[in-house]
UniProtKB/Swiss-Prot annotation:
Pfam families: ArsC (PF03960). GO terms for molecular function: arsenate reductase (glutaredoxin) activity. Keywords: Arsenical resistance, Oxidoreductase, Plasmid. The keyword Oxidoreductase applies. This is Arsenate reductase. Involved in resistance to arsenate. Catalyzes the reduction of arsenate [As(V)] to arsenite [As(III)]. Gene3D superfamilies: Glutaredoxin. It comes from Acidiphilium multivorum (strain DSM 11245 / JCM 8867 / NBRC 100883 / AIU 301). It catalyses: [glutaredoxin]-dithiol + arsenate + glutathione + H(+) = glutathionyl-S-S-[glutaredoxin] + arsenite + H2O. NCBIfam families: arsC (TIGR00014), PRK10026.1 (NF007456). GO terms for biological process: response to arsenic-containing substance. The active site is at 12 (nucleophile).
C-alpha cells in the first residue's frame, strides 16, 4: 500500500504533472478521482487543516457552481463552503497530495517536490515542455 495519496482530476494538466512527478520519485500513489469519489466531510476538514490553508483558499473560482452559488460573496461560513464543496466536488481545487512529509495543494505542480519522501529518479518536464528536474534528479527552480 502506498504512503502517498493524490486527489486527482485526470482532465487537469497540473494534476497530471503532479502525478507524474510522484511516479518519477519511484512511488506509485493511491489515486483518488475526487470528482467521482469526493472526500467525506471529516476527510475534507482534515485535509484543509493539514494543509494549513483557509477553506476559501481551496475553492475553485473558475467553475460554474462558484458563480451560480454566489460564492464570491463573504456571507458564507466555512461550514457552508465545505457543504458546497461536498455537493459540487468540482469546487475543490486540485491536486491535493498527502505524504508522510505533509499535505499540500500542489499548485503549481512542483510544490509536490517539497513533500515527496524520495528524490526524483531523473529528468522531468511538464506536459508543456517546462523542465522542472534535471537528469541528476535536482530541482531546477
Amino acid at each position: 500500500m502506498s504512503n502517498i495519496t493524490i486527489y486527482h482530476n485526470p482532465a487537469c494538466g497540473t494534476s497530471r504533472n503532479t502525478l507524474e512527478m510522484i511516479r518519477n520519485s519511484g512511488n506509485e500513489p493511491t489515486v483518488i478521482h475526487y470528482l467521482e469519489n469526493p472526500p467525506s466531510r471529516d476527510e475534507l476538514v482534515k485535509l484543509i487543516a493539514d494543509m494549513g490553508i483557509s477553506v476559501r483558499a481551496l475553492l475553485r473560482k473558475n467553475v460554474e457552481p462558484y458563480e451560480e452559488l454566489g460564492l464570491e460573496e463573504d456571507k458564507f461560513t466555512d461550514d457552508q463552503l465545505i457543504d458546497f464543496m461536498l455537493q459540487h466536488p468540482i469546487l475543490i481545487n486540485r491536486p491535493i497530495v498527502v505524504t508522510p512529509l505533509g499535505t499540500r495543494l500542489c499548485r503549481p505542480s512542483e510544490v509536490v517536490l517539497d513533500i515527496l519522501p524520495d528524490a526524483q529518479k531523473g529528468a522531468f518536464a511538464k506536459e508543456d515542455g517546462e523542465k522542472v528536474v534535471d537528469e541528476a534528479g535536482k530541482r531546477l527552480k
